[in-house]
Amino acid sequence: MTKKIDLAQIRVLLLGIWHFLLHLRQRLVEDQINIRAGHLAYVTLLSLVPMVAVTMSMLSAFPVFKGIRGQIEAFVYENFLPAAGDTVQVYINEFVGNASKGTAVGIAALVVVAIMLISAIDKSLNNIWRTKEKRSVVVAFSMYWMVITLGPVLVGASLVATSYVVSLKLFEGDALSGMMPLFIERLPLLFSVAAFLLLYMVVPNQKVKFWHALLGAVVAALLFELGKKGFAFYVTKFPSYEAIYGALATIPILFVWVYLSWMIVLLGAEITAAMPEYLDYESSSNAGETQPLAE
């Protein structure tokens, strides 16, 4: 009897997952996330240098971050730009150095371009959530400005806090010292989960449940880590792009990786947005009021 009950529960669970995946596939087709990801990748490449310039300027305003700027850069490029991170870092730092020498008008233009990226992300995610009510211009600008100003500070503060925790004598014992390499190794994954969770909860102009956002964030973070390893493996083992593009090989590598990254971000958003729809369908279906979400 127990085995039959267990098998029945497993069957119901698998059937529920299957129906959810069908609904998710239908959503992905309707929202054309491949086209959205391409648009966001294009805007990201245009905004990359301005965004980095504004970020570094914000960090430079706080003396506590000046000594660890190199560590922050190394962490970001190593963990978010696989394989070609060193080359990209050299070029971006050179571009940022040139941009920082500009006039007040030029710096204002950099901020505007950086806001364009955040605005594009905002519109894409709210379209995924089918948000009908738009934010007012004042609220939207305030949110974008908060992301630009507070985002870099929070990232820098988290890295400083992590470095401080790792350096504590509390972790120098034999039992705990073996855990630190594992903790540091998992740090990029934890940062990714936190970043995706914040993105999926704050950006949509409607209430998003924590557990729904956490599910989407965990899936996106895991795919992001797998994507980094897979992309780095391809770039190092099959370097045909270098023979084709030569010195410009970094450009297509960066574009492809940014495109794949946005595909992952949007997929996590679709999962988060699809969860309440599917759960509402399940509750209504049990009451005999609705038809299946997807065939």
Swiss-Prot record:
Pfam annotation, one family: Virul_fac_BrkB
InterPro entries noted in UniProt: UPF0761_bac (IPR023679), Virul_fac_BrkB (IPR017039)
Main location: membrane
Keywords, alphabetical: Cell inner membrane, Cell membrane, Membrane, Transmembrane, Transmembrane helix
PANTHER family cross-referenced by the UniProt entry: INNER MEMBRANE PROTEIN YHJD, UPF0761 MEMBRANE PROTEIN YIHY
Family: Belongs to the UPF0761 family.
Annotated protein name in UniProt: UPF0761 membrane protein SO_4401
